Amino acid sequence: MGFSFDWDDIFQYSTVKIVRIRDRRLGILHLSFLVGIVAYIVVYSAIIKKGYLFTEVPIGSVRTSLKGPNTFASNLTYCSNQQHNGSTYPFTPLECNYWDEQLALFPVGQDSTFTCTTRVRLSKQEANCNFTDPTCKFVDEPGSAKNIYIADIESFTILIDHTMYASSSGSQFNAVDLHGYILNQDGDEVQIDANGTSIGVSGKPDIMTIGQLLSFGGVSLDQASPVDSNVSIRYDGVVLFVFITYSNTYTYSTSDFKYVYSVQQIANTIYDVPETIILESIHSRLLYKRHGIRVIFIQTGTIGSFHFQTLLLTLVSGLGLLAVATTVVDQLAIRLLPQRKSYSSLKFQVTESMSNPMKKRITTDEGEDVLYTRIEGL
């Protein structure tokens, strides 16, 4: 039994064919798809979403400094050594000491972080043994340990000096050169410029009180600690994230830069750090176990610059929708409409072998096949 091959079938070539179907239903549907897709690509992707911008996250540095108030508050309810004018404190009050910024700030010299003390456990410790002995340990001198609060820490002011840099666009600014905002508890962007404090005012450094910083994060030092409801945050300490978000994409002018502070308390976290002061010998020391407000600055944001390749990619990625629209209309024409048989036979054509006269078979809507010969002249 022999096998015969038709080389024209084996090496057949499929090509694109354009058929103009005079059907208003298909035409209006396809035109609607095209208008919607062009509007999506040009208006939404390219213009509204700024698909012509190459964006990057800036880097930067943050420097902070602390300053005590000119006049301290008194009669504080959390101070056991002060008059309270009949007010009560919901937690156990402690003795209060008035410290300046040099004492209240610890640790010092850290990048992108800031810490100020709210409570200290002070103790004098002695090691009446030789450190060659593995059991040698420091112990508190009897009666030397005491807890104190740092009075009126909320009135201290913090200066925040930050700089941002975006490598691709070459943008570099200091906070003094920009206008900025801080988010309040309602999520609104606000500026501050009163009573010696300022936030986001171009030409002025950012200065706010510790109390303002806490309030923007929804934190009070006299609310319950997140890990022990029997003591306050003033007693245990707190850790805050301060996000500095830079942007030049909030308008259609990439020369307009701004930054926004947002303060977020880290849940279920307190802060303490030990400070050791050696006295007359290494066997004698003062131990300050500090609890306080730990602020961690995180610089982020979106800096954009015009980039032709990014615009081209935005346009090309949307053009794929045009092929989808054409496919949907084609399938509607050849599978769903009453004229689907005629439309299908017009869309798909299989020629006779090149060795035979060219013919074309078309199916009518009634299902009848009509054979055309010499189709080169059709």
UniProtKB/Swiss-Prot annotation:
Effect of D330A: Loss of function
Pfam families linked to this entry: P2X_receptor (PF00864)
Single annotated GO MF: intracellularly ATP-gated calcium channel activity
Identification of the protein by name: P2X receptor A
Keyword Cell membrane: no
GO BP of this protein: calcium ion transmembrane transport; cellular hypotonic response; contractile vacuole discharge; contractile vacuole tethering involved in discharge; hypotonic response; intracellular water homeostasis; monoatomic ion transport; positive regulation of vesicle fusion
Residue segments, region Pore-forming motif: 290-303
Protein's UniProt keywords contain Ion transport: yes
Subcellular location field: Contractile vacuole membrane
Keywords for the protein's UniProt record, in alphabetical order: Ion channel, Ion transport, Ligand-gated ion channel, Membrane, Receptor, Transmembrane, Transmembrane helix, Transport, Vacuole
Transmembrane residue ranges: 28-48, 308-328
Knocked-out gene: effects: Response to extracellular ATP remains the same in p2xA null strains. p2xA null cells have been reported to have compromised contractile vacuoles and defective osmoregulation, and exhibit cell swelling. This is contradictory to other reports. Quintuple p2xA/p2xB/p2XC/p2xd/p2xE null cells exhibit a slight delay in their osmoregulatory response, but are ultimately still capable of regulating their cell volume in water. Extracellular purinergic response to ATP persists in the quintuple null cells with no alteration in the kinetics of the response, but the magnitude of the response is lower.
Coiled-coil region(s): none
Membrane side Cytoplasmic: residue ranges: 1-27, 329-378
Family to which this protein belongs: Belongs to the P2X receptor family.
Superkingdom per UniProt: Eukaryota
GO cellular component terms given for this protein: contractile vacuolar membrane
Its job: P2X receptors are ATP-gated ion channels that play a role in intracellular calcium signaling. Not required for the purinergic response to extracellular nucleotides. Inward currents evoked by intracellular ATP and ATP analogs. Exclusively selective for ATP over other nucleotides. Insensitive to P2 receptor antagonists PPADS, suramin and 2',3'-O-(2,4,6-trinitrophenyl)-ATP but inhibited by nanomolar concentrations of copper and sodium ion. More permeable to ammonium than either sodium or potassium ions and less permeable to choline.
Major subcellular location class: membrane
Phenotypic consequence of K289A: ATP elicits smaller currents
Residue spans, topological domain Lumenal: 49-307
